[in-house]
Amino acid sequence: MSILNSGSCMMTDTNQNMECKVDFKKGEFDLQPLQINQFGFTKTQLHKPLTRNLSNKEDTHVPKRQKVSEPYFRGETERNVKSHQDRAASIYHEAMNGASGIHKQMSLPEYSPQMGNSWEIQVPMTTRHSISETPTKPFTATTAIAGSAGSLPRNTTIGLPGPSALLKHESGKNENQVRVCLYHKHYSRWYLPFDKDDDNQLVEAYAKYFSSENRPSIFYVLQGISFGPECEYVLRRKHWWNPWAEKVMRREIVERKIDTHPGCRTVAERYEQIEASGSEELLIIPIYKINMWVLSLLLFSAGGSVLIGLWMRLSDPSFAHGMLLNLGIGSIGSFLYLLSNTWCR
């Protein structure tokens, strides 16, 4: 059965496709088989791909673009979060599975100038539980310092976070545990809890492994970690553009309250407000020790600039006054620049 529509129709058969053409003058039907090639195009469409087939009536109506609704964006956000969680889980499982009985050798730099040679840390991350179980169960990590005499490997139990802990900040309940904040090249930051029995070498080893950088020198060495109420100790990157910042060493960590609330004139007022509200907003400020050659270089340059300015002031009073002021401001600015790159980082 065929249907007429504007002088053309299509007749479908089970064996072959037939093209139905109507001649209005003769009132007859002209049935011709469609010559379809292997790509699904007719002969007319193959020679003239940009012209439409006159045997078929095409709908030229273009529908309006639908307005993107808010649930669509919400769904996209949920999918992005899901993908990030999957990536975090894959890295976590890779770290755990990479550790099925395999000893990972981690070469670390010297921690003190008194040590004559560098030492290495072996971290055989042997899991005591499968990945399908709760990931917050601890596993045993062994550290062996090869460079120091008389040291023996010791076992340390550490509770590593699961994949969900890599993406969100969760407050801990263990008073003998500290959370170290690491920077990852795929994620903004993630946390690793360490107990008071863990030393700085183990912190540095895990910082190297979980950062996926294979360059432990980009992290500062944590010295003098005091394990008290849980707070964030951050392993910061070194400034690659500042050679003076590569020479500093972190000696201790001081806890200070954040003084950013409007209306607070002193840190003590902000501390009282935080204590009254019961919230814990802590800012970890690292204290650095400047090398003596850097400090002597700054003092020498500042003193030299002042002496040159005084000499120019005595030789030409009309000209050297502005030069002395510029040199003094420059020396003070250079000193403040060094302080900003060492203490205020």
UniProtKB/Swiss-Prot annotation:
Example of a GO cellular component annotation carried by this entry: membrane
Main location: membrane
Keyword annotations from UniProtKB, A to Z: Chromosome partition, Meiosis, Membrane, Sporulation, Transmembrane, Transmembrane helix
Protein topology in the membrane: Multi-pass membrane protein
Residues passing through the membrane, by range: 292-312, 319-329
Localization (cell): Membrane
Presence of keyword Membrane: yes
GO BP field: chromosome segregation; meiotic cell cycle; sporulation resulting in formation of a cellular spore
Primary role: Required for correct meiotic chromosome segregation. Appears to also have role in sporulation.
Name of protein: Meiotically up-regulated gene 97 protein
Gene name per UniProt: mug97
